[in-house]
């Protein structure tokens, strides 16, 4: 799963600090890989990437969201600028 955020570059350090909370949530809920990337060619473009065991497991993650988790997500979304929400992409392995 990738989530693309557009943020004010002046708030990058603050955004990265907030994303540490989301990393803990993703890991707790089964992500075995989590990274946050910045685009060196597009200032303010940040991409969260995480992997879970399966599509079903990812769907289950949505069912396990707590009130506290939702508050963290909303805090992070507040960094996102632009008219559209953060772009979410779901990729599944072509072969297993």
Predicted segment positions?
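Short coil/turn motifs at secondary-structure junctions
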Residues: 8-10, 41, 53-55, 95
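Short, well-ordered alpha-helical segments
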Residues: 13-20, 70
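Short, conserved charged micro-motifs
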Residues: 10-15, 57-60
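Short glycine-/aliphatic-rich beta-strand segments at the starts of folded cytosolic domains
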Residues: 1-8
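A short beta-turn/loop motif at secondary-structure boundaries
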Residues: 37-43, 80, 92-94
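An amphipathic, aromatic/His-enriched active-site/gating alpha helix that lines ligand/cofactor pockets
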Residues: 24-33, 51-87
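Short, glycine- and small/hydrophobic-rich beta-strand elements in well-ordered beta-sheets
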Residues: 20-47
